[in-house]
């Protein structure tokens, strides 16, 4: 299976325009035969906690239907970031689209302290069975909580995919955490991060994949939008941009 992570810049608070941009990256992943594609944390709004209350919606929002259509027609599982709400609370969520299945909302269970006054912690840990893999989704600060990756390990996850906002001063620490998660739990681990600015942060890019020894085996740069694809069978790494360039670096 080919697993893709998207490294993008989001437009602050503009769900409609961000959906348009997401569709371009989804189509690029489909062209490269990806079976899974995951975007950064709160990718459809940008990481903008102060706007979450007015932007929050739910998985059945009709604006998301074209993402579902692409999933259905192309057999791809897609994870996008979105603030969601119920009758009382607001959550940092990943909406998961699977072919011809009801959408899933996975909400961040372990919140960063500054998020706690605004958001409620999710209560429903999940893993996803996709082809021959078991995928554990994670949202940013969850990589700092051992209980999250321990749940993944107990449930026989093979892939750990973190949807994050990691900024310039925090990227090295986040990369170390994900390397350790890979090594200590026998998980191929991924990080989908932003470039540009979001939430007042200068985002660091460097979206990455680590093998089960914790070795960094693929990484995008710190500035360019692109997708990073890993083939779980052949171990091939592919890097693509919308203009067709193949990104190159030392990984």
How would you label these PLM feature ranges?
Residues 7-13:
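Short polar catalytic/cofactor-binding loops
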Residues 62-79, 144-227:
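CN hydrolase (nitrilase-like) catalytic-core segments centered on the catalytic cysteine
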Residues 35-36, 135, 159:
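Structural motif
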Residues 1-5:
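Extreme N-terminal starter segment of soluble prokaryotic enzymes
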């Amino acid at each position: 299976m080919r697993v893709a992570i998207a490294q993008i810049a989001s437009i602050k608070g503009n769900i409609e325009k961000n959906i348009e941009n997401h569709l371009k990256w989804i189509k690029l992943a489909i062209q490269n035969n990806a079976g899974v594609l995951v975007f950064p944390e709160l990718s459809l709004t940008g990481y903008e906690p102060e706007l979450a209350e007015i932007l929050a919606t739910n998985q059945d929002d009709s604006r998301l239907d074209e993402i579902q259509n692409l999933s259905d027609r192309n057999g791809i599982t897609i994870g996008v970031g979105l603030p969601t709400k119920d009758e009382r609370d607001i959550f940092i969520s990943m909406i998961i689209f699977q072919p011809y299945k009801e959408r899933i909302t996975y909400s961040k269970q372990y919140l960063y302290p500054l998020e706690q006054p605004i958001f409620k912690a999710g209560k429903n840990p999940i893993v996803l069975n996709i082809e021959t893999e078991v995928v554990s989704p994670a949202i940013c600060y969850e990589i700092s909580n051992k209980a999250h990756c321990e749940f993944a390990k107990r449930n026989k996850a093979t892939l750990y995919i973190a949807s994050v906002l990691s900024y310039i001063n925090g990227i090295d620490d986040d990369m170390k955490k994900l390397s350790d998660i890979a090594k200590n739990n026998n998980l191929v681990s991924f990080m989908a991060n932003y470039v540009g600015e979001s939430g007042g942060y200068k985002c660091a890019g460097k979206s990455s994949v680590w093998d089960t020894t914790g070795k960094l085996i693929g990484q995008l740069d710190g500035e360019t939008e692109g997708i990073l694809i890993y083939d779980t069978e052949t171990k091939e790494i592919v890097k693509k941009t919308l203009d067709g360039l193949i990104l190159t670096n030392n990984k």
